[in-house]
Amino acid sequence: MTRIQTVLGSITPNLLGRTLTHEHVALDFEHFYKPPPADFENELQQKISMATLGYVRLYPYSSRENVRFYDEEALEASRKDVLLYKKHGGGAIVENSSYGLKRNLEFIVDLAKTTGVHFIAGTGHYIHATQDATHTNLTVEQMTDLYTRDILTGIDVKGRTVKCGFIGEVASVYPVQEFERHALLAAGEIQEVLGCGVSLHPHRVSKAPFEIMRLYLEAGGHANKCVMSHLDRTIFDMDELLEFAKLGCYLQYDLFGTECSYYQLNSTVDMISDGQRIENLIKLINEGLVDRLLMSHDIHTKHRLTSYGGHGYHHIHMNILPRMFQRGVTLEQVEQMTVTNPANWLSFNA
């Protein structure tokens, strides 16, 4: 019988509930800091406040405070929003912080114990540039051993053994670097053996998802247990997205709540709005792909938490799903995307 491995132990899939499949509750995103425009340097160097929030929303990666998503203030703000998520019907959060993002398993375990939300932690490697010297020279075999150990044996967290429940997020740039290729191959090899879920993070060009899926599949990974993240900032052309969908993985729109068209990490494109995300999901539903769709926010900076003027982890449930119902999406289809699909993806013989 398949089960889902949470940080507090394995559960049956029917207990998971409504699930956010790509979030962070604590991580270090300082690698992506970008110097602010000279005209706004003073505002972006200050603490986040009502006076500076407008600048931070437009240039989120130019505020050092904003990308320090790991200090005590951030943890308390994150805890507050997880409680709001639980209050408004949330059941589970898939925490995608992998090696290179300084995941905080102690905090994740504490959140799971104190909020009642199921947390599923990931193993895997983020992009090469975020890794420290203990990881940069790992071979495919060494990565395979590490990921397998994290899932089957577990990690000691203050005397508690915590097992990871999926591989992810496994991230890469474009073209894929050798270290990142190793991580993708390791993910595919382990997935074939264990049957666990995998979450991939593509670079910000439309060719990237195709390339990393090819590597993952060639290593033996199963498409129906793999999530392609961040498609709402990667593949904008619907025909190209439908072509990608033929590969058989889950298609994830995970930047809900990001309503600024200026995308600082790739200023050559315009970030789509929540309205466009809804429109695209409806198109994919009409193409018969509802059983392959996932939704989330990918919160990874402070300004997206309610304590800093943001939308929090409950945004999809409180603001997006009602709009989807208004546009003809059925309760059955919403349950498929937010409950059934996450459970199917995360279930394996744990």
Curated annotation (Swiss-Prot):
InterPro entries linked to this entry: AryldialkylPase_Zn-BS, Metal_Hydrolase, Phosphotriesterase
Entry cofactors: a divalent metal cation
Native source organism of the sequence: Drosophila virilis (Fruit fly)
Binding site for a divalent metal cation 2: E169, H201, H230
UniProt keyword annotations, A-Z: Hydrolase, Metal-binding
Lineage per the UniProt record: Eukaryota, Metazoa, Ecdysozoa, Arthropoda, Hexapoda
Binding site for a divalent metal cation 1: H22, H24, E169, D298
Top EC group: hydrolase
Annotated protein name in UniProt: Phosphotriesterase-related protein
GO MF, one example: hydrolase activity, acting on ester bonds
E.C. numbers: 3.1.-.-
CDD domains reported in the protein's UniProt record: PTE
